[in-house]
Protein backbone atom coordinates (compact mmCIF):
# COMPACT_ATOMS: atom_id res chain seq x y z
CA UNK A 1 0.00 0.00 0.00
CA UNK A 2 1.47 3.39 -1.01
CA UNK A 3 1.96 6.43 1.16
CA UNK A 4 -0.77 9.07 1.41
CA UNK A 5 -0.05 12.78 0.97
CA UNK A 6 -1.99 15.93 1.79
CA UNK A 7 -1.72 19.06 -0.32
CA UNK A 8 -0.68 22.07 1.77
CA UNK A 9 -0.73 24.87 -0.82
CA UNK A 10 -3.91 25.62 -2.74
CA UNK A 11 -2.46 28.53 -4.68
CA UNK A 12 0.05 28.79 -7.51
CA UNK A 13 0.88 26.29 -10.18
CA UNK A 14 0.15 22.61 -9.49
CA UNK A 15 3.83 21.83 -9.90
CA UNK A 16 4.62 24.28 -7.09
CA UNK A 17 2.13 22.85 -4.61
CA UNK A 18 3.49 21.51 -1.31
CA UNK A 19 2.47 18.19 0.15
CA UNK A 20 3.06 16.38 3.42
CA UNK A 21 3.00 12.66 3.98
CA UNK A 22 0.20 11.49 6.24
CA UNK A 23 1.05 9.16 9.08
CA UNK A 24 -1.20 6.48 10.45
CA UNK A 25 -2.40 6.67 14.04
CA UNK A 26 -0.15 3.72 14.88
CA UNK A 27 2.89 5.64 13.68
CA UNK A 28 1.92 8.67 15.75
CA UNK A 29 1.43 6.54 18.85
CA UNK A 30 4.79 4.87 18.28
CA UNK A 31 6.50 8.25 17.93
CA UNK A 32 4.82 9.49 21.10
CA UNK A 33 5.86 6.34 22.95
CA UNK A 34 9.46 6.61 21.72
CA UNK A 35 9.65 10.26 22.81
CA UNK A 36 8.12 9.47 26.20
CA UNK A 37 10.46 6.56 26.91
CA UNK A 38 13.47 8.54 25.76
CA UNK A 39 12.62 11.48 28.03
CA UNK A 40 11.76 9.28 31.01
CA UNK A 41 14.47 6.63 30.99
CA UNK A 42 17.50 8.13 29.23
CA UNK A 43 18.92 9.11 32.63
CA UNK A 44 18.98 5.40 33.48
CA UNK A 45 20.97 4.51 30.36
CA UNK A 46 18.07 3.51 28.08
CA UNK A 47 18.55 5.53 24.89
CA UNK A 48 16.36 6.11 21.87
CA UNK A 49 18.31 3.63 19.74
CA UNK A 50 17.58 0.94 22.33
CA UNK A 51 13.88 1.79 22.17
CA UNK A 52 13.77 1.85 18.37
CA UNK A 53 15.31 -1.62 18.29
CA UNK A 54 12.17 -2.90 20.03
CA UNK A 55 9.87 -1.57 17.31
CA UNK A 56 10.48 -4.74 15.32
CA UNK A 57 9.18 -6.73 18.29
CA UNK A 58 5.44 -6.37 17.83
CA UNK A 59 4.50 -7.86 21.21
CA UNK A 60 6.88 -5.60 23.14
CA UNK A 61 5.63 -2.46 21.42
CA UNK A 62 2.05 -3.60 21.90
CA UNK A 63 2.64 -3.96 25.64
CA UNK A 64 4.32 -0.56 25.87
CA UNK A 65 1.59 1.13 23.83
CA UNK A 66 -1.02 -0.41 26.13
CA UNK A 67 0.73 0.94 29.21
CA UNK A 68 1.27 4.48 27.97
CA UNK A 69 -2.34 5.82 28.18
CA UNK A 70 -2.72 4.52 31.75
CA UNK A 71 0.61 6.00 32.75
CA UNK A 72 -0.22 9.40 31.24
CA UNK A 73 -3.64 9.46 32.89
CA UNK A 74 -2.21 8.59 36.30
CA UNK A 75 0.63 11.08 35.87
CA UNK A 76 -1.84 13.84 35.05
CA UNK A 77 -3.94 13.01 38.13
CA UNK A 78 -0.81 12.97 40.28
CA UNK A 79 0.29 16.39 38.97
CA UNK A 80 -3.13 17.95 39.57
CA UNK A 81 -3.44 16.53 43.09
CA UNK A 82 0.09 17.58 44.00
CA UNK A 83 -0.69 21.12 42.88
CA UNK A 84 -3.98 21.25 44.80
CA UNK A 85 -2.67 19.74 48.03
CA UNK A 86 -1.16 22.92 49.46
CA UNK A 87 -4.34 24.99 49.03
CA UNK A 88 -7.10 22.44 49.55
CA UNK A 89 -9.46 22.71 52.57
CA UNK A 90 -8.48 20.74 55.65
CA UNK A 91 -11.55 18.50 55.50
CA UNK A 92 -10.50 17.08 52.10
CA UNK A 93 -6.74 17.05 52.62
CA UNK A 94 -6.66 13.56 54.15
CA UNK A 95 -8.63 12.07 51.26
CA UNK A 96 -6.43 13.87 48.76
CA UNK A 97 -3.28 12.55 50.45
CA UNK A 98 -4.60 9.00 50.11
CA UNK A 99 -5.33 9.49 46.40
CA UNK A 100 -1.91 11.05 45.90
CA UNK A 101 -0.27 8.09 47.61
CA UNK A 102 -2.26 5.73 45.39
CA UNK A 103 -1.16 7.54 42.22
CA UNK A 104 2.48 7.51 43.34
CA UNK A 105 2.36 3.77 43.99
CA UNK A 106 0.80 3.08 40.59
CA UNK A 107 3.40 5.23 38.82
CA UNK A 108 6.24 3.48 40.63
CA UNK A 109 4.89 0.08 39.66
CA UNK A 110 4.39 1.08 36.04
CA UNK A 111 7.95 2.45 35.96
CA UNK A 112 9.14 -1.02 36.91
CA UNK A 113 6.94 -2.61 34.24
CA UNK A 114 8.23 -0.20 31.58
CA UNK A 115 11.84 -0.85 32.54
CA UNK A 116 11.48 -4.64 32.67
CA UNK A 117 9.72 -4.60 29.31
CA UNK A 118 12.47 -2.49 27.75
CA UNK A 119 15.49 -4.38 29.07
CA UNK A 120 14.14 -7.85 29.77
CA UNK A 121 11.87 -10.58 28.49
CA UNK A 122 8.77 -9.28 30.22
CA UNK A 123 5.28 -8.58 28.95
CA UNK A 124 1.97 -7.82 30.61
CA UNK A 125 -1.46 -7.87 29.07
CA UNK A 126 -3.94 -5.09 29.75
CA UNK A 127 -6.16 -7.40 31.80
CA UNK A 128 -3.33 -8.21 34.20
CA UNK A 129 -2.43 -4.55 34.51
CA UNK A 130 -6.04 -3.67 35.33
CA UNK A 131 -6.01 -6.34 38.02
CA UNK A 132 -2.86 -4.79 39.44
CA UNK A 133 -4.44 -1.34 39.47
CA UNK A 134 -7.56 -2.74 41.14
CA UNK A 135 -5.35 -4.31 43.79
CA UNK A 136 -3.81 -0.94 44.54
CA UNK A 137 -7.26 0.62 44.70
CA UNK A 138 -8.36 -2.03 47.21
CA UNK A 139 -5.25 -1.62 49.33
CA UNK A 140 -5.57 2.15 49.44
CA UNK A 141 -9.28 1.88 50.22
CA UNK A 142 -8.40 -0.32 53.18
CA UNK A 143 -5.76 2.19 54.22
CA UNK A 144 -8.34 4.93 53.97
CA UNK A 145 -10.71 2.98 56.23
CA UNK A 146 -7.93 2.49 58.78
CA UNK A 147 -7.19 6.21 58.71
CA UNK A 148 -10.88 6.95 59.24
CA UNK A 149 -10.96 4.66 62.28
CA UNK A 150 -7.85 6.33 63.69
CA UNK A 151 -9.45 9.71 63.12
CA UNK A 152 -12.58 8.62 64.97
CA UNK A 153 -10.45 7.43 67.89
CA UNK A 154 -8.67 10.78 67.98
CA UNK A 155 -11.98 12.65 67.83
CA UNK A 156 -13.33 10.52 70.67
CA UNK A 157 -10.23 11.28 72.72
CA UNK A 158 -10.56 15.00 72.07
CA UNK A 159 -14.24 14.91 73.06
CA UNK A 160 -13.35 13.09 76.28
CA UNK A 161 -10.76 15.74 77.14
CA UNK A 162 -13.25 18.49 76.40
CA UNK A 163 -15.88 16.91 78.65
CA UNK A 164 -13.36 16.58 81.48
CA UNK A 165 -12.44 20.25 81.16
CA UNK A 166 -16.10 21.27 81.16
CA UNK A 167 -16.89 19.07 84.16
CA UNK A 168 -13.89 20.29 86.15
CA UNK A 169 -15.60 23.44 87.59
CA UNK A 170 -18.66 21.38 88.51
CA UNK A 171 -16.50 18.85 90.33
CA UNK A 172 -14.75 21.64 92.22
CA UNK A 173 -18.11 23.10 93.23
CA UNK A 174 -19.35 19.74 94.49
CA UNK A 175 -16.10 19.23 96.39
CA UNK A 176 -16.65 22.59 98.11
CA UNK A 177 -20.15 21.52 99.16
CA UNK A 178 -18.80 18.28 100.59
CA UNK A 179 -16.19 20.19 102.59
CA UNK A 180 -18.92 22.39 104.13
CA UNK A 181 -20.70 19.36 105.64
CA UNK A 182 -19.92 18.35 109.28
CA UNK A 183 -17.09 15.91 109.62
CA UNK A 184 -17.93 12.38 110.62
CA UNK A 185 -16.41 11.48 114.03
CA UNK A 186 -13.80 8.84 113.46
CA UNK A 187 -11.49 9.56 116.45
CA UNK A 188 -11.44 7.67 119.77
CA UNK A 189 -13.93 8.85 122.46
CA UNK A 190 -12.63 11.65 124.70
CA UNK A 191 -12.14 11.30 128.50
CA UNK A 192 -15.37 13.18 129.14
CA UNK A 193 -17.32 10.72 127.05
CA UNK A 194 -15.65 7.86 128.89
CA UNK A 195 -16.64 9.27 132.33
CA UNK A 196 -20.22 9.76 131.24
CA UNK A 197 -20.30 6.20 130.02
CA UNK A 198 -18.90 4.94 133.41
CA UNK A 199 -21.47 6.93 135.42
CA UNK A 200 -24.24 5.56 133.29
CA UNK A 201 -23.06 2.04 133.86
CA UNK A 202 -22.86 2.67 137.69
CA UNK A 203 -26.42 3.89 137.91
CA UNK A 204 -27.64 0.94 136.02
CA UNK A 205 -25.95 -1.38 138.53
UniProtKB/Swiss-Prot annotation:
Cellular compartment(s): Virion tegument; Host cytoplasm; Host Golgi apparatus
A Pfam family: Herpes_U44
Post-translational modification, as annotated: Phosphorylated. Palmitoylation is necessary for Golgi localization.
GO cellular component labels: host cell Golgi apparatus; viral tegument
Residues spanning the signal sequence: none
Covalent lipidation (S-palmitoyl cysteine), chain numbering: 4
Chief location bin: virion
Entry keyword Lipoprotein: yes
Keyword Lipoprotein: yes
Keywords, in A-Z order: Host cytoplasm, Host Golgi apparatus, Lipoprotein, Palmitate, Phosphoprotein, Virion, Virion tegument
Family statement drawn from the similarity comment of this UniProt entry: Belongs to the herpesviridae UL51 family.
Subunit structure: Oligomerizes. Interacts with U75; this interaction mediates U75 incorporation to virions.
Function description: Plays several roles during the time course of infection, including egress of virus particles from the perinuclear space and secondary envelopment of cytoplasmic capsids that bud into specific trans-Golgi network (TGN)-derived membranes.
Protein known as: Tegument protein UL51 homolog
Amino acid sequence: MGNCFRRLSLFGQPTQAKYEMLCSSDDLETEELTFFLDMTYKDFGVYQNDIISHQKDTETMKTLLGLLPMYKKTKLRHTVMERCLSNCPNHVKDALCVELMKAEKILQTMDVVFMKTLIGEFSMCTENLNQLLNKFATDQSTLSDVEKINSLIEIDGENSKRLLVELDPILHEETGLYQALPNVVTEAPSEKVKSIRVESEGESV
